[in-house]
Swiss-Prot record:
Similarity comment: Belongs to the trt14 isomerase family.
Quaternary data: Homodimer.
Protein name in UniProt: Austinoid biosynthesis clusters protein H
Single GO biological process annotation from the record: austinol biosynthetic process
Pathways per UniProt: Secondary metabolite biosynthesis; terpenoid biosynthesis
Effects seen without this gene: Impairs the synthesis of austinol and dehydroaustinol and accumulates (5'R)-isoaustinone.
Stated role: Part of the gene cluster B that mediates the biosynthesis of austinol and dehydroaustinol, two fungal meroterpenoids. The first step of the pathway is the synthesis of 3,5-dimethylorsellinic acid by the polyketide synthase ausA. 3,5-dimethylorsellinic acid is then prenylated by the polyprenyl transferase ausN. Further epoxidation by the FAD-dependent monooxygenase ausM and cyclization by the probable terpene cyclase ausL lead to the formation of protoaustinoid A.
Additional observations: In A.calidoustus, the austinoid gene cluster lies on a contiguous DNA region, while clusters from E.nidulans and P.brasilianum are split in their respective genomes. Genetic rearrangements provoked variability among the clusters and E.nidulans produces the least number of austionoid derivatives with the end products austinol and dehydroaustinol, while P.brasilianum can produce until acetoxydehydroaustin, and A.calidoustus produces the highest number of identified derivatives.
Lineage of origin: Eukaryota, Fungi, Dikarya, Ascomycota, Pezizomycotina
Amino acid sequence: MVMTNILCQILSDDLPELPPCREPSKGMIVGNLGMTSNTMTTEGPFAKLDVESVLSFMSPSCTLRSFPSSLGKPALQTKEESKADFQGLKDFFYNFQLRVKDGAEPVIDEPARKVVLHIEGKGDSLVGRFETEYVYILQINEEGTMVEDFFQFADSATRDAWGKKIEAHFSARN
């Protein structure tokens, strides 16, 4: 039931497959992310690019796995190693917002404590608007308050195209 409450903080309360939501507890994952309904608010840590807050929903031993390998990121990072990646976003983005993609229902396996989400990300950057998609697979701790393992599969074509724009931007400045 705890995972359902976490997801109710992400998703609208009118999803028929979920039991009615209880009042979220203070330490729940999505509350830490600044999510309401099915979107992370403009006041949330992703929008503000507040690195400590973004990582606050990960347990101290959380691992982050990023795919596809063509992105050139290490296949496995610790929470501490992930900090530099998130910090680097502040150099390029003015804001960044994540939301569950319209029409994409989450996959929730409470006994296994796993959640699968299809996410869309949008933000304003040095080189214009950035829009992308991710699939997140989250392994949640027994209390339902922290992510123990964070698997993300990113849209590599969009990221590559945006990376080329960033390179061109900095080349033009030099």
